[in-house]
Amino acid sequence: MLEVNILDKKWCSIIENPKNFVLGVINASLKELKIDHYKPNISIALADDDLLHQLNLKFREMDKPTNVLSFPYEQLSNECDLGDIAISIDTIKRESHEYYIPILAHIAHMLVHGLLHLLGYDHQKKDEEIIMKNLEREILASLGYNMCAI
């Protein structure tokens, strides 16, 4: 089951129906990755910089907000619990403006990025980063987004 929690009303001023948008991106990503039949449990928090700053400080010891954080469950159950994703509308807006990226494309990118982290992908090493970025590009292209600028 996919659960979307809107924790900041700014999301509703940018996307007419944030829950449907998020569910569409995540479901299409799972389909593109050919794992949609597993029906994983994922919770997505549509938040702001305040919450992402707190989470980033608590879990990564970084004293600043960030665009997206993923919290994979340590032990998967039979129901395929993948984990939680938190995403900040404030940072997304700032980065969209700074890098001239359409905001919906950037939101989709950060959702895909967070999902890939839940699935075990990482970008700490160069070879891992290449694999993850290629997957992001493929998924975003299937959604109609061009990731050239990112």
Curated annotation (Swiss-Prot):
InterPro entries: MetalPrtase_cat_dom_sf_prd (IPR023091), YbeY (IPR002036), YbeY_CS (IPR020549). Binds 1 zinc ion. Zn(2+) binds at residues 113, 117, 123. One of its GO terms (biological process) is rRNA processing. Its cofactor is Zn(2+). Keywords: Cytoplasm, Endonuclease, Hydrolase, Metal-binding, Nuclease, Ribosome biogenesis, rRNA processing, Zinc. It is found in: Cytoplasm. Its EC number is 3.1.-.-. Its main location: cytoplasm. GO terms for molecular function: metalloendopeptidase activity; RNA endonuclease activity; zinc ion binding. GO terms for cellular component: cytoplasm. Single strand-specific metallo-endoribonuclease involved in late-stage 70S ribosome quality control and in maturation of the 3' terminus of the 16S rRNA. This is Endoribonuclease YbeY. It comes from Wolbachia sp. subsp. Drosophila simulans (strain wRi). The gene is ybeY.
